[in-house]
């Protein structure tokens, strides 16, 4: 059997991280087991569907690398087939026309409530004489179409939850509507009609759709179509245990794209929201996720969207990326932020890449690299007031340490991390001071900050000329500003 799975978002907003997780699991399944991953835009709600939202869905999926295998299906273009399927149901005696008005139905619900009962449609229109139905239709009386729910039970073997069964008398309000009085299909009918046409073999979606599944299975059966497998994924909650929403912060894939999150890190993070690869594995490349993915690892328990975990995950992926690849991402950001122009970065390519190697292993996002890189680029450095207060508290002593370091380093023949470390350790011993007493004033001189990578790494990445110039500039500043 060829597996055919689909992701079917409604274009009424951004691509939510929950939707992206669903798309990812569908995509991983076909990459692992073979088949096609399809995209359907469920745009039947014309009042809320927008082209902007459709573009956001496309852009989000493309950024994540979740490419679909066939032309996009637009549900709204299938209206005639939806109506034809409803007509088949009516002709087969599986559905019937309902002439009850909204007011009449409200009265029935109120009566049921007064009796302390749940409302179930009483099938009064199903008992109409066929000639009466024909007469009303010919007279132009508005009607909806209801599916005739049979007695018994509807069950399926869910890939996540195991066997799920619904007594048919507990399905919604009884005979449910499949076509509105304006001749537009209800969600459950349109979904089944499209899934049949698209030859979908597995429906993988959020477990908030479990209650829709028995209705859909009944429609499949009534249309004489093969019933696909179902897999209902756990919901994604915020840290407070409630369904993830905007009040928890960013929930759109596009938001994280612009916050310095890497697509492969987002995929890795999303994959662990409802799936376990086993063996306590967390950090994975996309090929590793494909290799390890199994429906047996899908989880029932609601997943928690932890932004700090996402940032940690992103840092892991960022640290493993080659500097050249990091440069492709951050260079446009550095240029657009006005920190440096591309010509400058190109002219210092080796030092630029060395600096990225230095920063990427400590950064959580690409945005952090952009914010931290300025001190490592040509030009003077701005001294942070807090760094001056802490690192240069004893200004005369700091100037002495910096001057000695500049003198020692200027005579160093080989400017590499090992040589720099040996040189500065000898200097600390010669001066009879601790490493911190020497390194901290130098750190402020080189970066203007109190926190940075190791001093030897900084010197190696900056190179001889810029490092010595920074130390000389710091001497001058400390001389001018005294104690």
Please tell me what each predicted stretch does.
Residues 51, 55, 65, 74, ...:
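Conserved nucleotide- and phosphate/pyrophosphate-binding catalytic cores
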Residues 1-115, 212-225:
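N-terminal Rossmann-like or analogous alpha/beta NTP/dinucleotide-binding catalytic cores
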Residues 9-15, 203, 426-432:
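A short glycine/serine-rich beta->alpha loop
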Residues 5-9, 197, 248:
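Glycine/charged-rich beta-loop-alpha catalytic/anionic-binding loops adjacent to active sites
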Residues 27-28, 59-61, 188-192, 442:
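Hydrophobic alpha-helical segments in the ANL/AMP-binding
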Residues 43-45, 197, 204, 317:
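A generic structural motif
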Residues 97, 101-232, 237-244, 252, ...:
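Active-site cores that bind ATP or allylic diphosphates and position pyrophosphate for catalysis
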Residues 12, 70, 199-200, 251:
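Short, solvent-exposed beta-strand edge segments and adjacent coil->beta transition regions
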């Amino acid at each position: 059997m060829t597996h055919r799975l689909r992701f079917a978002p409604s274009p009424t907003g951004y691509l939510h991280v929950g939707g992206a997780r669903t798309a990812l699991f569908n995509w991983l399944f076909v990459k692992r087991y073979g088949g096609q991953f399809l995209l359907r835009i469920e745009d039947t709600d014309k009042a809320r569907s927008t082209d902007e939202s459709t573009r956001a869905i496309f852009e989000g999926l493309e950024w994540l690398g979740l490419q679909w295998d066939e032309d996009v299906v637009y549900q709204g273009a299938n209206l005639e087939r939806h109506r034809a399927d409803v007509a088949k149901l009516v002709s087969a005696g599986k559905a019937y026309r309902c002439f009850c008005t909204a007011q009449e139905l409200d009265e029935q619900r109120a009566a049921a409530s007064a009796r302390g009962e749940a409302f179930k449609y009483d099938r009064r229109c199903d008992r109409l004489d066929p000639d009466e139905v024909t007469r009303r239709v010919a007279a132009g009386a508005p009607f909806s179409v209801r599916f005739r729910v049979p007695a018994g039970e509807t069950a399926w073997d869910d890939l996540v939850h195991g066997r799920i069964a619904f007594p048919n008398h507990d399905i919604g309000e009884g005979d449910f509507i499949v076509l509105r009085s304006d001749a537009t299909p209800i969600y459950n009918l349109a979904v089944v009609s499209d899934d049949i046409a698209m030859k979908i073999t597995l429906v993988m979606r959020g477990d908030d759709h479990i209650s829709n599944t028995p209705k859909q299975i009944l429609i499949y059966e009534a249309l004489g179509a093969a019933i696909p497998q179902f897999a209902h994924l756990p919901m994604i909650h915020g840290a407070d245990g409630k369904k993830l929403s905007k009040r928890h912060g960013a929930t759109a894939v596009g938001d994280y794209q612009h916050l310095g999150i890497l697509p492969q890190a987002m995929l890795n993070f999303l994959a662990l929201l409802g799936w376990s690869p086993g063996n306590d594995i967390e950090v994975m490349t996309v090929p590793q996720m494909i290799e390890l993915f199994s429906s047996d690892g899908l989880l029932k328990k609601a997943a928690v969207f932890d932004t700090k975990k996402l940032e940690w995950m992103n840092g892991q992926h960022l640290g493993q990326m080659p500097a050249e690849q990091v440069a492709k991402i951050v260079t446009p950001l550095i240029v657009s932020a006005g920190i440096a122009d591309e010509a400058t970065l190109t002219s210092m390519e080796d030092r630029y890449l060395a600096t990225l190697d230095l920063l990427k292993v400590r950064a959580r996002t690409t945005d952090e690299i952009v914010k931290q890189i300025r001190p490592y680029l040509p030009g003077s450095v701005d001294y942070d007031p807090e760094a001056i207060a802490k690192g240069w508290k004893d200004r005369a002593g700091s100037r002495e340490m910096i001057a000695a370091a500049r003198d020692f380093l200027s005579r160093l023949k080989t400017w590499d991390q090992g040589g720099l470390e040996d040189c500065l350790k000898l200097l600390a011993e010669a001066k009879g001071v601790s490493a911190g007493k020497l390194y901290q004033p130098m750190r402020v001189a080189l970066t203007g900050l109190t926190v940075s990578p190791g001093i030897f790494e900084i010197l190696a990445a900056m190179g001889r000329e810029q490092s010595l110039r920074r130390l000389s500039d710091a001497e001058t500043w400390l001389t001018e500003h005294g104690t």
